[in-house]
UniProtKB/Swiss-Prot annotation:
Similarity field: Belongs to the universal ribosomal protein uS13 family.
GO cellular component: cytosol; small ribosomal subunit
GO molecular function (one): tRNA binding
Keywords, comma-separated and alphabetical: Ribonucleoprotein, Ribosomal protein, RNA-binding, rRNA-binding, tRNA-binding
Quaternary structure and interacting proteins, as annotated: Part of the 30S ribosomal subunit. Forms a loose heterodimer with protein S19. Forms two bridges to the 50S subunit in the 70S ribosome.
Start and end residues of each stretch annotated as Disordered: 89-121
Protein role: Located at the top of the head of the 30S subunit, it contacts several helices of the 16S rRNA. In the 70S ribosome it contacts the 23S rRNA (bridge B1a) and protein L5 of the 50S subunit (bridge B1b), connecting the 2 subunits; these bridges are implicated in subunit movement. Contacts the tRNAs in the A and P-sites.
Thylakoid keyword on record: no
Name of the molecule in the record: Small ribosomal subunit protein uS13
An example Gene Ontology biological process: translation
Record bears the keyword tRNA-binding: yes
Biased composition (Basic residues): 106-121
């Protein structure tokens, strides 16, 4: 099992799909990384040579992935909260950030509905 960027990649998948298991790598980025490394996209992970793995690791060094990316995202959210922006307030209150309505929906962000005793009459 190839271990790249601290993630164990599945052996039986094509490398272009296996790279998407790394946080911060989608399909487009995976194709670009493989093109930079000179590795064909249809190769299975188990068939990679150690030289190809090293080339992929070198190409991934230019991309921000895993822990660095998670840290940057959390710092961005923290910065929005500290400056008191509208988006920061929505993050702090656990409400949708991007303008969705909350009168009826937004259950994913708001959590399970809490009934209020004595409301129905």
């Amino acid at each position: 099992m190839a271990r790249i960027a601290g993630v164990d990649l599945p052996r039986d998948k094509q490398i272009v799909i296996a790279l998407t298991y790394i946080f911060g790598i989608g399909n487009t980025t995976a194709v670009k990384v493989l093109a930079d490394a000179g590795v064909p996209t249809d190769v299975r992970t188990r068939d990679l040579t150690p030289d190809q793995e090293d080339k992929i690791r070198a190409a991934l060094d230019t991309v921000k992935v895993e822990g660095d990316l998670r840290r940057e995202v959390s710092l961005n959210i923290k910065r929005l909260q500290e400056i008191g922006s509208y988006r920061g307030m929505r993050h702090r209150r656990g409400l949708p950030v991007r303008g969705q309505n909350t009168k009826n929906n937004a259950r994913t962000r708001k959590g399970k509905k809490v009934s209020i005793a004595g409301k129905k009459k």
